[in-house]
From Swiss-Prot:
GO terms for molecular function: 4 iron, 4 sulfur cluster binding; 4-hydroxy-3-methylbut-2-en-1-yl diphosphate synthase activity (ferredoxin); 4-hydroxy-3-methylbut-2-enyl-diphosphate synthase activity (flavodoxin); iron ion binding. GO terms for biological process: isopentenyl diphosphate biosynthetic process, methylerythritol 4-phosphate pathway; terpenoid biosynthetic process. This is 4-hydroxy-3-methylbut-2-en-1-yl diphosphate synthase (flavodoxin). It comes from Vibrio campbellii (strain ATCC BAA-1116). InterPro entries: Dihydropteroate_synth-like_sf, IspG_bac, IspG_bac-typ, NO2/SO3_Rdtase_4Fe4S_sf.
Length: 372
């Protein structure tokens, strides 16, 4: 069954990205970034919709040129999830996407020009209630900080971040969040820990350039898991060299494992051994694929034998304990009279899980605004 997380989250200020609350105890938002050419409006819209389907709260889109800004206008008109525009160097692009309804600007004040240009972007953001994300990356530190520290260090990343924070402070702008990403787990974790002691603004978590689907998921889980367990973090992105949809899935799996935010089915399944009375691995894989559309939080245990099966089933919403030819079925911790044919488990379990999801959440829709 679902249990409350023991984690006490860091206190932070509240901002809004579109209608998604960030910080001050709001549910941790999961986001990704498109990897299509932004000027390919059709492909970008399709990818954003795919991300939204698996639960993305926010989607970031790179806007490197004015042509991309014009494409962003068309993209924004066709999607409902809040969009962050990722902008570097040309402050005029930030002003343009602000006209087109962007929900958040990802910039570094230090790389978009002089004080006058920074002020024009900040004034525009203030007038239109658009928050800003300051994004510091260990791979693109300012040259003077590289010279000062010799290599990326937590102190270097945080000093870079605080420079940008000071820019916004001087302009009396406080609607922003900050990230200090690095590809090294310990560098990223120590940077976020240090930054969390210095500012009250929301923190966006990420291990940048984490790697492919498997290695990147592991690295991100280790790094973000440490921070989240300490209560640090208000939004997150899992950076994978893979389909962005996988980033959202991994992000929710991390939050689910820490009992911070649950979305969809939490499958409790044994790794299988010679005691299994049915094919556990293929059963779980098939159910995960079939039930991706279920977002109602629930625990489903699928254990191939009677050694651990009953115990896990008794603390799950639904449970299966393998037995010869027919397996025992549990609901809300109680063994039911009906037994499931081991040759047709996937179809039988899918029907039961869908019915249970409907009971647990009649609307079959939980969103971050309602969770707040």
């Amino acid at each position: 069954m679902q249990h409350e997380s023991p984690i006490i989250r860091r206190k932070s200020t509240r901002i809004y990205v579109g209608d998604v609350p960030i910080g001050d105890g709001a549910p941790i938002a999961v986001q990704s970034m498109t990897n299509t050419r932004t000027t390919d409006v059709e492909a970008t819209v399709a990818q954003i919709r795919a991300l939204e389907k698996v639960g993305a709260d926010i989607v970031r889109v790179s806007v490197p040129t004015m042509d991309a800004a014009e494409a962003f206008k068309l993209i924004k008109q066709q999607v409902s999830v809040p969009l962050v525009a990722d902008i570097h160097f040309d402050y005029r692009i930030a002003l343009k996407v602000a006209e087109y309804g962007v929900d958040c600007l990802r910039i570094n004040p230090g790389n978009i020009g002089n004080e006058e240009r920074i002020r024009s972007v900040v004034d525009c953001a203030r007038d239109k209630n658009i928050p800003i994300r300051i994004g510091v990356n260990g791979g693109s530190l300012e040259k003077d900080l590289q010279m000062k520290y010799g290599e990326p260090t937590p102190e270097a990343l945080v000093e870079s971040a605080m420079r940008h924070v000071d820019h916004l402070d001087r302009l009396n702008f406080d609607q922003f969040k900050v990230s200090v990403k690095a590809s090294d787990v310990f560098l990223a974790v120590d940077s976020y820990r240090l930054l969390a002691k210095q500012i009250d603004q929301p923190l966006h978590l990420g291990i940048t350039e984490a790697g492919g689907a498997r290695a990147g998921a592991v690295k991100s889980s280790v790094g973000l898991g440490m921070l989240l367990a300490e209560g640090i973090g208000d939004t997150l992105r899992i950076s994978l060299a893979a389909d962005p949809v996988e980033e959202i899935k991994v992000g929710f799996d991390i939050l689910k494992s820490l009992r911070i935010r649950s979305r969809g089915i939490n499958f409790i399944a044994c790794p299988s051994c010679s005691r299994q009375e049915f094919d556990v691995i293929n059963t779980v894989n098939a159910l995960e694929e079939r039930l991706e559309d279920i977002i109602t939080p629930m625990d489903v245990s699928i254990i191939g034998c009677v050694v651990n099966g009953p115990g896990e089933a008794e603390v799950s919403h639904l449970g299966l304990a393998g037995s010869n030819k027919k397996s025992a079925f549990y609901e809300d911790g109680k063994r039911q009279k009906e037994r499931f044919d081991n040759d047709d488990l996937v179809n039988q379990l899918e029907a039961k899980i869908r019915a249970k999801a409907s009971v647990l959440d009649q609307a079959n829709r939980i969103d971050i605004k309602q969770e707040d």
